[in-house]
Amino acid sequence: MNLTYCLLVTGPHYGTEQASSAYLFAKALLEKGHHIAQVFFYREGVSNANQLVSPASDEFDLPKAWIALASRYNIPLQVCVAAALRRGVVDEQQAKEQGLLSSNMATKFELSGLGALAQAMLTCDRVVQF
């Protein structure tokens, strides 16, 4: 039986295993034929959306991996707007509204509120937090 999952990522792109475990879990789900309705990045997890992350050449580029996965499987990558702004992750619209020089949110990621997470949770068979 194929299930629909929502993933909640609260860990940063580097420094803990939360985000990388979420990514590997997502890949495994998709390979088994399950569906991911949404990946929601909250708290420190919003750092996964920062396009200015520049890992060493011998390190796994997790933000780019999320983008590739989302592109391949058409998965929304939602980023909590309040958590993102507190941590300096902004899209073009927020950069303009806040009077900032530029944005740093990677493509495929989009700002949204906790309401988007709540809506997704109502339709998913499983919600898994990392």
Swiss-Prot record:
Q: What is this protein called?
A: Sulfurtransferase TusD
> Which segments cross the bilayer?
none
List S-S links within the chain: none
Molecular function terms, GO-annotated: sulfur carrier activity; sulfurtransferase activity
Question: Active site at which residues?
Answer: C80 (cysteine persulfide intermediate)
Q: Indicate whether tRNA processing appears among the record's keywords.
A: yes
Task: Specify the enzyme's EC class, one word.
Answer: transferase
Classification via Pfam families:
DsrE
Q: Which GO terms describe its biological process?
A: tRNA wobble position uridine thiolation
Alphabetically list the UniProt keywords. Answer: Cytoplasm, Transferase, tRNA processing
State the family it belongs to.
Belongs to the DsrE/TusD family.
On the tree of life, the source organism's domain of life is: Bacteria
Tell me where it resides: Cytoplasm
Q: What InterPro entries is this protein classified in?
A: DsrEFH-like (IPR027396), Sulphur_relay_DsrE/F-like (IPR003787), Sulphur_relay_TusD/DsrE (IPR017463)
Sum up the protein's function in the record's words: Part of a sulfur-relay system required for 2-thiolation of 5-methylaminomethyl-2-thiouridine (mnm(5)s(2)U) at tRNA wobble positions. Accepts sulfur from TusA and transfers it in turn to TusE.
Q: Which Gene3D superfamilies does the record associate with it? A: DsrEFH-like
SUPFAM superfamilies in UniProt:
DsrEFH-like
So what EC number does this one have?
Answer: 2.8.1.-
